């Protein structure tokens, strides 16, 4: 396909989803089954309104059954499923349309997702796309019966280990996904939707207490310092604001945010997307709070020249202001998080520093209610 978007000054090629691949393979299989012919390409309409002309491969014909594949192209998106082959096996049924997952397609084991527990992880929009192409082909050939469709993915079980599926409780393979049929490179929307899906799963287990960490540093610190497992919460990446929004929308009452100062300090400036491309402000935020705590002009100048928050904390330590400044920042973080949540949830924060130290030796600061919330989360973990 030749669809492009411009992002961060670069022209990036779009791709197509596993859902589009599945629908295309099904359409090709149905055409070859009903038309008693062989085709090497097929056109499918996507929900986004873009028509795709996709190549068909691995054609295997039997008397009443056709199997074929479509290779996914994720464009310029760094997608682990790029290049995967999605297969469809199509055969006739008397009336209904049955869509099932075969080898390499995940199986849902936890509630809260768009597919029911026990079902193949083929999401509603791809299922609808499959039904629409079958209806189209049936009308073309005057066919009044039904179809059995089995979708599979080459090496799907191995590839799935690199996706969010294990954390979502989807086992044995990848998911057939896509709401638009098109992959936009580095799509923030796709990342946020993944976080939402993970929250949906976790709140079916517990929506009273919730752990949020931006990434692996926070996850490891939470586990090794406090015994808190991210299974009781989510990794939110840079999307702290969107995560808080969705947690509050789902009536989560108590949220504990644990992360490194380099990311969390930005929240003290009201920055809710902490990616450096969106905003930085680390030096400015630390410098402002250092000034409030009585730092010298030389100290503030040194902070403004620093490259990392760990370097800043060394400067503050030498000035005798490390604790005061970090606590001041922490209170402002809590203020902005409460404001974002419209004061509808109790939010506590743990912020740690010194990435070069061993986990057990890292300095950390916490808001007044964080210790009690950690205890409650530990109790919930014991129940689970």
Swiss-Prot record:
Question: Pfam families, alphabetically?
Answer: CbiD (PF01888)
Pathway connected to this protein: Cofactor biosynthesis; adenosylcobalamin biosynthesis; cob(II)yrinate a,c-diamide from sirohydrochlorin (anaerobic route): step 6/10
Q: What is this protein called?
A: Cobalt-precorrin-5B C(1)-methyltransferase
Query: What InterPro entries does the annotation carry?
Result: CbiD, CbiD_sf
Q: Which reaction does it catalyse?
A: Co-precorrin-5B + S-adenosyl-L-methionine = Co-precorrin-6A + S-adenosyl-L-homocysteine
What keyword terms does UniProt attach to this protein? Answer: Cobalamin biosynthesis, Methyltransferase, S-adenosyl-L-methionine, Transferase
A GO BP term here is: anaerobic cobalamin biosynthetic process
Q: Which gene encodes it?
A: cbiD
The EC number on file is 2.1.1.195
Similarity-based family: Belongs to the CbiD family.
- GO molecular function per UniProt: cobalt-precorrin-5B C1-methyltransferase activity
